[in-house]
Amino acid sequence: MHGLFISFEGIDGAGKSTHIAGLADAFRAQGRAVTLTREPGGTPLAEKLRDLVLNDAMDSLTEALLIFAARRDHLVRVIAPALVRGDVVLCDRFTDATFAYQGAGRGFDLAVLATLEQWVQSDEGLLGDPAGNFPMKPEVETVIEPHLTVWFDLPPEEAALRLQGARVPDKFEAQPLEFFRRVAKGYSDRQQGHPERFARINASQPRDVVWQAVRQVFVAKGWLA
């Protein structure tokens, strides 16, 4: 059985986590093995890098490099092996978040992010070679990317209200509203650039309505009954 790689995107407060858990239960009820993971993170090394990225001050290039370093380890140790096994991989954020937060939010060069994406996410040595050899050439033809990205689209103003008093914010959650407006625009731009991969969900709706919309995306693809 072929593996499925599904990512979930949206600004903080959009409600991704609840629906990721619901989808994991739905896939398991159909007998599928599920790998639940997140970014930055997903491995011991990547979780250490996550803590640095979320809490330590650094320049934008350092931040981007740490995120992609965490992503490479995550791909090598978790995502690629799970896909080879035939698992359904449900990942809370992936590269689209980097383009939205670091690119649109921080104003980091999108061309540099695209180059890092090509290098780090090359499928050479991951889906075919268990050794995970790194491709020592810049011309990478294919990259590992989600089969589907579920984007929980929520206005930044509404997200801010949901997060009030929820927890101590990390350095991203503590950013001003204008930052999240740029991030939301970044997600919209990514959807427009990859319409075949993105499924936009109106996350402003009641939770049960959002869940039905999410589930219907998977039913329509024949992945859930």
Swiss-Prot record:
Keywords on record: ATP-binding, Kinase, Nucleotide biosynthesis, Nucleotide-binding, Transferase
InterPro entries: P-loop_NTPase (IPR027417), Thymidylate_kin-like_dom (IPR039430), Thymidylate_kinase (IPR018094)
GO biological process: dTDP biosynthetic process; dTTP biosynthetic process; dUDP biosynthetic process
Binding site residues for ATP: 10-17
Example of a GO cellular component annotation carried by this entry: cytosol
Entry EC no(s): 2.7.4.9
Superkingdom of origin: Bacteria
UniProt xrefs under PANTHER family: THYMIDYLATE KINASE (PTHR10344), UMP-CMP KINASE 2, MITOCHONDRIAL (PTHR10344:SF4)
Name of this chain's protein: Thymidylate kinase
The species this protein was found in: Polaromonas sp. (strain JS666 / ATCC BAA-500)
Gene: tmk
